[in-house]
């Protein structure tokens, strides 16, 4: 994922920042408690495609 793109993307729910997951397969929105998938290098920013973060993931800094 291009870091410049990551800098301008925001969570569609909270409008807050997103963080790239450690394995670089998801964009994490702590505010919404969601992880948006990245497929073929393209972030899928749909709430219906996102997974809910686990309690442990929500607590990670």
Curated annotation (Swiss-Prot):
InterPro entries: Trm112-like. Gene3D superfamilies: 2.20.25.10. One of its GO terms (cellular component) is cytosol. It comes from the Bacteria. Belongs to the UPF0434 family. This is UPF0434 protein PP_1901.
């Amino acid at each position: 994922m291009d870091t410049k793109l990551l800098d301008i993307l925001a969570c569609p729910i909270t409008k807050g920042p997103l963080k790239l997951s450690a394995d670089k397969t998801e964009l994490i929105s702590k505010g919404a408690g969601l992880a948006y998938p990245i497929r073929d290098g393209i972030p899928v920013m749909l709430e219906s495609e996102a997974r809910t973060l686990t309690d442990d993931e929500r607590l990670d800094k």
